[in-house]
UniProtKB/Swiss-Prot annotation:
Expressed in roots, rosette and cauline leaves, and flower buds. Transcriptional repressor that regulates multiple aspects of plant growth and development through the regulation of BEL1-LIKE (BLH) and KNOX TALE (KNAT) homeodomain transcription factors. Required for embryo development. Residues 49-62 have a biased composition (Polar residues). The keyword Nucleus applies. It comes from the Eukaryota. It is found in: Nucleus. It comes from Arabidopsis thaliana. This is Transcription repressor OFP5.
Amino acid sequence: MMRWGRKKPVSSSSSSGLSRALPVSWFSKLSGSSDLKPAKEKKQDEKASQNISVKTSLSSTTRRSDIHENSKRFQRVSVEKENSATRSADKESNEKFEEIMSSVRKKVRDFQKETCGFLEVEAMDRDNGTVILTPRIQVNRDKQRCERRDQRLLEQKPKRSEQDAGVKVKKPARRTGTGGYSREDSVILGHTITKPAHQWEKLKEVKLREVKLKADQQRKSLYLKRELNRIGTKENNKVRVFSPRASEKCRVKAIEDLKKAKQRAREHELLIETADGGMENESFAVVKCSSDPQKDFRDSMIEMIMENGINHPEELKELLVCYLRLNTDEYHDMIISVFQQVHNDFNFH
């Protein structure tokens, strides 16, 4: 039979053993859990510190790379600016030089068209050298020779005009591809043989006298014909060549021909003046045997600049035109390169 009531009391020994075991186990568990927690926290702290150090190192490397790239970019920009400035300066100087060269080439082409009949000086090899032409001041001997030639022409021309009663105005000699000019209008290496003013006046007076004589004869013949017609001869309504109108035309034509001849002589003088770059008319080309044409061209240009006091680009341009006209096409590139060097050395603006 079961008894209802209180439970049996537990013995004191068992209860004391449990009481001893329970606190120890709980403390050991608590201490174990407390020991585990700091270790985990330490690991987490170490990982966080490692991540932070990695991040800081990455950020520092990215900053350094950015700074390096920025410095490189700045250097590139500065170099590009300097290059663009030098390019613009070079371009400006090249444009100025090209402008000068284009005007010079145009003048040379115009001169070659107008003076295609200039006497050509053939290049000769002397001691394996090259013959070049440079402008110089003419010596007195050549000047005297040309003056004597002009005097002979002055003496010969009035005799011809007096002997030939029906003389006509002489047309200027045509210039052939390799031929020369007429004797009166010839141009020899920069010197022009021209007629003085008093000679032109004499020729003009002679021509006017001839025209007046012809007009008087025509008027007399016309008067005689009219008298014959009055007597009873058959009238003719056609305009005769002896009419005053025809004589007036002949007189005007003679004066115009004289003016044209004088104008041609003046044009030749102007051509030689422009060829000499504004220097004296009495200049000529010196034929020189050279083993180094480039050096000789440079020395000659510098000498001409110093002697004539050339200090403007226009005067230097005229000097270049003179060199290009005097020499053949094979030396033109060399002359232009030497001109560019001299232009840069003297710093013409």
